[in-house]
Amino acid sequence: FSPNSPSDVARCLNGALDVGCGTFACLENSTCDTDGMHDICQLFFHTAATFNTQGKTFVKESLRCIANGVTSKVFQTIRRCGVFQRMISEVQEECYSRLDICGVARSNPEAIGEVVQVPAHFPNRYYSTLLQSLLACDEETVAVVRAGLVARLGPDMETPFQLLQNKHCSQGSNQGPNS
C-alpha cells in the first residue's frame, strides 16, 4: 500500500458512511499517521454483544459521534498533520465524555476489558485517548480497567507494568538527582 495523502483521506471520509468502521478505515495508512481508530472501532464492534443495553448504545453512538465529528471538521484541519491528529483525539475525547464512557465501563467491566487490549502497534495516540478517558473515571472504575488491562498483559509484562506504575520513594526522601 502506498500512503494516502491528506486529500485522499478527505475524499474517502466524504464518501464514508457514518455507521460501521468505514470512516476509520479512511484514516489508516495515511501520510499523517492517523492509524489506530479503525482497530478501536473493530474492537468495539466485535465486543458489542457482550455489553449491556447502555453499553451497546454507547458503542453505536460513540462511533457515530466520532465519525461525524471527524468528517465535519476534516476540511478545516487536513492541511497540517499535527492539527488533524489533535482534532481526531479531541473529537474522540468529547464523544466519550458526552456519552458517559465511565458509566459504561462501570456497568460493563468485562466488555470494556476486551476493548482495552494492548494495541499491536505502539504508539497509538487514539488508543491512548481511549485509555486516558477511562483513567479519568472514578477510582473504582479505574481499578477495574487497570486490573483488566494487567490481566491481559500476561505474566511477562505484568511485573514491568506494575513497577512503572508504583512509586517507591518515600515522601520524606530527598534523594533525587538534584540533592
From Swiss-Prot:
Tissue specificity note: Produced and secreted by the corpuscles of Stannius.
Disulphides: C12-C26, C21-C41, C32-C81, C65-C95, C102-C137
Recorded GO CC terms: extracellular space
Native source species: Oncorhynchus keta (Chum salmon)
UniProt superkingdom: Eukaryota
Cross-referenced InterPro entries: Stanniocalcin
Function: Its primary function is the prevention of hypercalcemia. Upon release into the circulation, it lowers calcium transport by the gills, thereby reducing its rate of influx from the environment into the extracellular compartment. STC also stimulates phosphate reabsorption by renal proximal tubules. The consequence of this action is increased levels of plasma phosphate, which combines with excess calcium and promotes its disposal into bone and scales.
Similarity comment text for this entry: Belongs to the stanniocalcin family.
Keyword Ion transport among record annotations: yes
Keyword set, alphabetical order: Calcium, Calcium transport, Disulfide bond, Glycoprotein, Hormone, Ion transport, Secreted, Transport
Localization (cell): Secreted
Protein name: Stanniocalcin
PANTHER family for the chain: STANNIOCALCIN
Residue positions the entry lists as glycosylated: N29
